[in-house]
Amino acid sequence: MTVRTKVSTKDIDEAYLRLKNIVKETPLQFDHYLSQKYNCNVYLKREDLQWVRSFKLRGAYNAISVLSNEEKNKGITCASAGNHAQGVAYTAKKLNLKAVIFMPVTTPRQKINQVKFFGDSNVEIVLIGDTFDHCLAQALNYTKQHKMNFIDPFNNVYTIAGQGTLAKEILNQAEKEDKTFDYVFAAIGGGGLISGVSTYFKAHSPHTKIIGVEPTGASSMYQSVVINHSIVTLENIDKFVDGASVARVGDITFDIAKDKVDDYVQVDEGAVCSTILDMYSKQAIVAEPAGALSVSALEQYKKQIENKTIVCIVSGGNNDINRMKEIEERSLLFEEMKHYFILNFPQRPGALREFVNDVLGPQDDITKFEYLKKTSQNTGTVIIGIQLKHHDDLIQLKDRVCQFDPSNIYINENKMLYSLLI
């Protein structure tokens, strides 16, 4: 069997017909808050409302459904940080197939539980590897040994075509309301979504600019297409945006992206966290980190999108509630609202009250106070966390901290120290 490497609009049209009674046609919603904030017309494609709460069902079902009966009977495997696994599990249950699903050990518990829920007895889960790429290597080895069929999360023509049905759906919905779009913002992990969407848009709405969005700590497509002009493997990636933390993109997705994606945006993980909280509080949308990437990119593109009509694909909503504390912490650090210092603190009654009176501003709060080391001397080493009401107050706060302890250490500027102590 010849392995195909080119995706056509015909592939996407055929995938659309296969998926018509399988996936949900998710809403294309006008967003008043973002439209007012950026002085443009912002529409959100709500794939967080899909049956498995992400777009990944489209590609997984399409890729599995084209297998022969003989191939289906041998069973399927996949490697996934969560959402593709849920799509494969849902499909395995629907088609009554055996599936072995490999997931990194860092996968949020919520996503693991959802895979079990969707796949039930049809699915076996193997947790292995710290990153997707390590997990992928183990899955491929297992697939070969057991002569099963690997369902690639992004580097497969049928997976990409399935994701591309999103673009067809967007254009169909827009046509009903006589709309056209100037920009589409979509997240990039391995590149399956951006490849499918860009393929269809460039054929049917060539004036629309396609903007790929990656987390700063895992910008493998940008590094490959723009910087290196060939596929690179990132040595280290930040795994926080787990749905888009891929060290190496696919060769098929790379070839499509370099020809059809107009620009790339890298978004700081802290900015993603701020977007997650903003979407929840302002729009009542529960987005996972990768699902919030497209909206996060608008801040960097605010001049270009003014008075334009744009679509942000909210690619997933599988967020683990147990991560919210970390999300809030990362957001506060990014917004420069929370600050940590190591101080030599007087070990005598009333010292903390003096610190509050002399160092803290009237609207500042102490969020952490912990002795690293108590001694018999006059001072002890303390970690102190301070949350500001306004980030503009930081300079004055640092000045007052220096007066209190000229030898203080500002932890925010040292990522390694922060990870060790906070």
Swiss-Prot record:
Record protein name field: L-threonine dehydratase biosynthetic IlvA
Pathway(s) served: Amino-acid biosynthesis; L-isoleucine biosynthesis; 2-oxobutanoate from L-threonine: step 1/1
Record SUPFAM superfamilies: ACT-like, Tryptophan synthase beta subunit-like PLP-dependent enzymes
Domain ACT-like, first and last residues per copy: 339-413
Gene Ontology MF terms in the entry: L-serine ammonia-lyase activity; pyridoxal phosphate binding; threonine deaminase activity
Cofactor dependency: pyridoxal 5'-phosphate
Annotated catalysed reactions: L-threonine = 2-oxobutanoate + NH4(+)
